Amino acid sequence: MELGIDILAMLFTAAFIAAFIDAIAGGGGLITIPALLMTGMPPAMALGTNKLQAFGGALSASIYFLRKRAVNLSEFSFILLMIFMGSVIGTLLIQNLDATLIKKGLPFLILAIGLYFLLTPKLGESDRKQRISYTVFALCFGSLLGFYDGFFGPGVGSLMNLACVTLLGFNLTKATAHAKVMNLTSNFASLIFFFIGGHVIWTVGLVMMAGSLIGANLGAKMVMAKGKQLIRPMVVIVSFIMTIKMAYDQGWFHF
């Protein structure tokens, strides 16, 4: 599939903006997937190519967080393994199952996340008592989060962030950093199988990845500099926008 320089420039810009937002609050796919579909790209190709550029953004942000020692990989390794395995299963199943039921319930879930962050102003203000062990988190939640990202994906960054805050007791900055590494892991797993299935347009994906690398790095720097005062309102705003977008796509506002 050949695209003109103007279209590639538009996709580069879309990836840059999406990755910046995604590094802070998640939801970048709301920008990049519609942008890819606007080019006339088949949906499967759009999803696979989006995973490539999203992987670049997640990698850029994760490297920044790791350099700042915001993530402890040795403690999180089993969680990342279960996320990887869950994402592999989800990616394989989405190629053979209908995701309609999940799509119908998703606006309610994303809205609930936004409302939770909005109505709990002290959420993630500081580290709190850990409610479950890393092992239990990995087995019960890591695998599910990975599965969801591989199977469908929208809002997974916000879900990972919320899980780290409420279950592991992380503050919002720490939770956002760990959520990005979790997202990197699930993206990598999905990308492998989209590649095997021939659903990645590399020229487009690499152009977008370049924009994503830059945007995600800037977003990660903002997270470390501004912390909760930036993350919380961004999560709320992105959650509400995602809810409206998904509800519109399902025809809720068509009269």
Protein language model annotation of sequence segments:
Residues 41-50, 73-78, 169-180:
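Membrane-interface alpha-helices at helix entry/exit sites of multi-pass transporters
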Residues 13, 17, 52-55, 59, ...:
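Hydrophobic residues within alpha-helical transmembrane segments
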Residues 60-70, 107-132, 241-255:
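Transmembrane helix exit motif
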Residues 38-39, 91, 95, 104, ...:
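Transmembrane helix-loop junction
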Residues 5-9, 48, 101-108, 136, ...:
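Alpha-helical transmembrane segments of integral membrane proteins
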Residues 48-101, 187-234:
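Selective hydrophobic functional segments
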Residues 1-42, 127-176, 206:
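Selected transmembrane alpha-helices and immediately adjacent juxtamembrane segments
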Residues 144-154, 190-198, 242-255:
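Hydrophobic alpha-helical transmembrane segments in multi-pass integral membrane proteins
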